Amino acid sequence: MNPSLGRRHFLAATGTAAAAATVATGGAGAAHAATGAAPTTAGTGTDTDTGTGTGTGTRPFPLGAVTLLDGPFRDNQRRNSAYLRFVDIDRLLHTFRTNVGLPSDAEPCGGWEGPGVELRGHSTGHLLSGLALAHASTGEEALRDKGRRLVAALAECQSAAPAAGFGTGYLSAFPESFFDRLEAGSGVWAPYYTIHKIMAGLVEQYRLVGVGQALEVVLRQARWVDERTAKLSYEQMQRVLETEFGGMNDVLADLHALTGDPRWLDVAERFTHARVFDPLAGNQDKLAGLHANTQIPKMVGALRLWEEGRADRYRTVAENFWQIVTDHHTYVIGATATARRSTNRTS
């Protein structure tokens, strides 16, 4: 076990933040989010992803503190920004609007965002995050303004949810009945995965761009998640967690960091997947056959819970996961799975 493991080390080792720059500090601050700026006053839209338990002395550079010079990285940044400007938000919003009875004459998206696909809506969350990150990196006003328009449109959809028969705060591109199916075990793709992507994108819009409406929307979503999951027994919730749920524990821990409300840590802990966490807590390798990339956001969430002051067990789970994967499930090219599934131990 690596006693110095922190969130930045863990993320880099699992390949999810290899490009993030870190800087040593002499203060007592914890590791901050891989996507954010240095923390300032809460509510200003900057990264306040601080933890109470890490004791680490590293944090990432604020994105705006680094300017890329001409070269391949700058070229890629320009391409990325151009793509973000190109994406038609009304096409992505089509299924959100029609889901709650709002008019839309936009052409629906295809692929995994098609109107008949159960994962629809997740790309909108990715776009929210991408716009926020790109604006924080470049200062480009068009990216900031596009993110604000998208947040405002999602807020309108959320406000229309009760009239459509959905719970207050519900926001998605598919009906709430998907969660009825999830809880009943009758088969559905991955509804909490999509909810996580939307919530994470809204958090980034608030934290990196300062869009206050984004925090309002994501807190209403979080209240909906709380009310929905509070009704389930422990056994029922564990069955729910057998279906991919992204990093729900991670984003809820972020809400605690932003608001100071311990309620969000309580809700985050409901997304502790015992079948995965319990063996790791005992340093047992039960990863073979699991959907590999599904486990990484769970572990990031475990670290965030520990950073925000919850049990040391969460750090132990994440440390053991990191050590087991890097020592026994990693190929020479850096991959940790075959066909997205963890394989038997490689060493």
PLM regions: where:
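Glycan-recognition and catalytic cores of secretory/periplasmic carbohydrate-active enzymes
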Residues: 5, 21-24, 33-347
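N-terminal secretory signal peptides and thylakoid transit peptides that target proteins
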Residues: 1-17
